[in-house]
């Protein structure tokens, strides 16, 4: 994960604990989780919209070709 080992992750967690305190950590984790969830939801929506437009595109081309014949 990002080229970090176990010792580096523990050190980062200790620094975060010192900076924000034990009281704020659950709030920070909750906010981070919500942000990641929202990002994934938006990413999925964009992907679905892209796939839908790609699926509709050949149908439009076939309809245009058929009407020209």
From Swiss-Prot:
Molecular functions per Gene Ontology: protein transmembrane transporter activity
UniProt-annotated location(s): Cell inner membrane
Alphabetical UniProt keywords: Cell inner membrane, Cell membrane, Membrane, Protein transport, Translocation, Transmembrane, Transmembrane helix, Transport
Record GO cellular component, one term: TAT protein transport complex
Pfam families: TatA_B_E
Major location category of this protein: membrane
Gene3D superfamilies tied to this protein: 1.20.5.3310
Alphabetical list of InterPro entries matching this protein: TatA/B/E, TatA/E
Biological processes per GO annotation: protein transport by the Tat complex
UniProt entry tagged with the keyword Transmembrane helix: yes
Residue intervals passing through the bilayer: 1-21
Stretches with biased composition (Basic and acidic residues): 47-63
Region annotated Disordered, chain positions: 47-69
Keyword set includes Cell membrane: yes
Record function comment: Part of the twin-arginine translocation (Tat) system that transports large folded proteins containing a characteristic twin-arginine motif in their signal peptide across membranes. TatA could form the protein-conducting channel of the Tat system.
PANTHER family referenced in this protein's UniProt entry, alphabetically: SEC-INDEPENDENT PROTEIN TRANSLOCASE PROTEIN TATA
Entry's family note: Belongs to the TatA/E family.
Subunit structure: Forms a complex with TatC.
Official protein name in the record: Sec-independent protein translocase protein TatA
Source organism (scientific name): Chlorobium chlorochromatii (strain CaD3)
């Amino acid at each position: 994960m990002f080229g970090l080992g176990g010792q580096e992750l523990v050190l980062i967690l200790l620094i975060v604990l010192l900076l924000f305190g034990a009281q704020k950590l659950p709030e920070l984790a909750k906010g981070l989780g919500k942000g990641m969830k929202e990002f994934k939801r938006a990413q999925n929506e964009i992907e679905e919209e892209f796939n839908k437009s790609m699926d509709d595109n050949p149908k439009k081309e076939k309809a245009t070709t058929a009407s020209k014949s």
